[in-house]
Amino acid sequence: MGKIPIKRILAIDYGKKRTGLAKTDPFCSFAQPVGTFPPEKIITIIKSFLQENSVEKIIVGYPLNSDGTKNPMTGIIDGFIEELSAAFPDIPVEPIDEHGSSKQAGKVLIESGLSRKKRQRKGRLDSAAACLLLQHYLENTGNA
């Protein structure tokens, strides 16, 4: 029997100070944190990730106001999506609404019992937000 190709989905919660990454398990059933990285190094980090993992899609948190209108960060994300598409032309990049994901990630970390210091260390909030974006995506596409 042949080997089943394993493809993952990579989620990005892009920020001006830190960028969180999350990936699916090999069967695209649930999200796992990858880590938090400086935004100026994120393309290099993703290239390295792609050398070790087969990725079928990249999703990017897309910041909209609660009424669905764009905000100042939306333009930055549009530029980042263009940069991703140019760097990785064979992988589709899909923006998904991230409204409230960081706030929800903060609540999850608080409920997990982590101290404020540990929640803030190494940008756990950013990778948790990327995980929540990805899990929400999986649930809405019927993968979870």
From Swiss-Prot:
Pfam families: RuvX (PF03652)
GO-annotated biological processes: rRNA 5'-end processing
Family the UniProt entry places it in: Belongs to the YqgF nuclease family.
UniProt EC number: 3.1.-.-
Top-level taxon of the source organism: Bacteria
Entry GO MF terms: nuclease activity
Organism: Chlorobium phaeobacteroides (strain BS1)
Keyword Nuclease recorded: yes
The entry's keywords: Cytoplasm, Hydrolase, Nuclease, Ribosome biogenesis
Any one of the GO CC terms: cytosol
Protein name as catalogued: Putative pre-16S rRNA nuclease
UniProt cross-references to SMART domains, sorted A to Z: YqgFc (SM00732)
SUPFAM superfamilies: Ribonuclease H-like (SSF53098)
Entries under InterPro entries matching the protein: RNaseH-like_sf (IPR012337), YqgF (IPR005227), YqgF/RNaseH-like_dom (IPR006641), YqgF/RNaseH-like_dom_sf (IPR037027)
Subcellular location: Cytoplasm
Function: Could be a nuclease involved in processing of the 5'-end of pre-16S rRNA.
